[in-house]
UniProtKB/Swiss-Prot annotation:
(6S)-5,6,7,8-tetrahydrofolate binds at S113, L114, L115, P116. Belongs to the Fmt family. InterPro entries: Fmt, Formyl_trans_C, Formyl_trans_C_sf, Formyl_transf_N, Formyl_transf_N_sf, Formyl_transferase-like_C_sf, GART_AS, Met-tRNA-FMT_C. This is Methionyl-tRNA formyltransferase. PANTHER family: METHIONYL-TRNA FORMYLTRANSFERASE (PTHR11138), METHIONYL-TRNA FORMYLTRANSFERASE, MITOCHONDRIAL (PTHR11138:SF5). Keywords: Protein biosynthesis, Transferase. Pfam families: Formyl_trans_C (PF02911), Formyl_trans_N (PF00551). It catalyses: L-methionyl-tRNA(fMet) + (6R)-10-formyltetrahydrofolate = N-formyl-L-methionyl-tRNA(fMet) + (6S)-5,6,7,8-tetrahydrofolate + H(+). It is an enzyme of class 2 (transferase).
Length: 315
């Protein structure tokens, strides 16, 4: 039986809320929750609370929403809670050194990769785009660096040929709470075994941009197919046809050699719109024109066949 800990939880999106939910069902005591300030959302730009705030308030846990933890008065909010440990999951604010050192056991973070690979903001998307065969979560002791702290616990899962960032997100949102509860038990019992990260194995997962999601036909078909899965559901891979953006939801690689220039449509069938790439052919199977719902290539061909005449060069 592990000892009950007084925990401050800091997180913002749904991924974080799933970890808070596991903690609320555990033997530990959540003494306070820190989450980002309410943000405008939706067409009406109404201020909306984060998923973490909604969950915390439903369980009558005190919620704090500073825009920064640098001011002394905001750091005092942390100190006054007298926590044993602070658990940080996709919080979105930097924790100053003073805050990291306040709880008796410091601060720990749930990171969505197998560190030291993919430190940074977009580990799920980068691992998928790179063609990694597995990913996972790492629970680490936080320090002032970017995901540089000692590793306390890891759980891994395979990346399948069908995975998107959305499906991987769900897998890691299930794995993370398991790893977190195990780590907390080890820390409470004094059995945790911190492991220093090997700096020679470090890679960085830079934040995604919408411009980066524009399909670059000079890449190989295999790279582009992974990119499309990595950028689903955000920011979504896209191409430009007739001056308007068209999102690509699903594609597959055709193992044929073509001598057409990258970006050239080589065939348009009900199975897919086949486009030459830097290496191989990419078949676009599910697309979404601006202002429309996602549709099969067959449905899009029925309404916009003039877009996909073989020999046409896509931007």
């Amino acid at each position: 039986m592990s000892h009950s800990l007084r925990i401050i939880f800091a997180g913002t999106p749904d991924f974080a809320a799933r970890h808070l939910d596991a903690l609320l069902s555990s033997e530990h005591q959540i003494v306070g929750v820190f989450t980002q300030p309410d943000r405008p959302a939706g067409r009406g730009k109404k201020l909306m609370p984060s998923p973490v705030k909604v969950l915390a308030e439903a369980h009558d846990v005190p919620v704090f929403q500073p825009s920064s933890l640098r001011p002394q008065e905001n750091q005092q909010l942390v100190a006054d809670l007298g926590a044993d440990i602070m658990v940080v999951v996709a919080y979105g604010l930097i924790l100053p050194k003073a805050v990291l050192e306040m709880p008796r056991l410091g601060c720990i973070n749930v990171h969505g990769s197998l560190l030291p690979r993919w430190r940074g903001a977009a580990p799920i998307q980068r691992s998928l785009w790179a063609g990694d065969s597995e990913t996972g979560v790492t629970i680490m002791q936080m320090d002032v660096g970017l995901d540089t702290g000692d590793m306390l616990y890891k759980l891994s899962c395979p990346i399948t040929a069908e995975d998107t960032s959305g499906s991987l997100y769900d897998k890691l949102a299930d794995l993370g709470p398991q790893g977190l509860l195990t780590t907390l038990a080890q820390l409470a019992n004094g059995t945790a075994q911190p492991e220093v990260q090997d700096e020679s194995l470090v890679s960085y997962a830079e934040k995604l941009s919408k411009e980066e999601a524009r399909i670059d036909w000079s890449l190989s078909a295999a790279q582009l197919e992974r990119c499309i899965r990595a950028f689903n559901p955000w920011p979504m891979s896209w191409l430009e046809i007739d001056g308007q953006p068209v999102k690509v939801w699903r594609a597959s690689v055709i193992a044929e050699v073509t001598h057409a220039e990258p970006g050239t449509i080589v065939a348009a069938t009900k199975q897919g719109i086949q486009v030459a790439t830097g290496d191989g052919i990419l078949s676009l199977e599910s697309l979404q024109p601006a202002g429309k719902k996602a549709m099969s290539s067959q449905d899009l061909l029925n309404s916009r066949r003039e877009w996909f005449i073989p020999g046409t060069r896509l931007a």
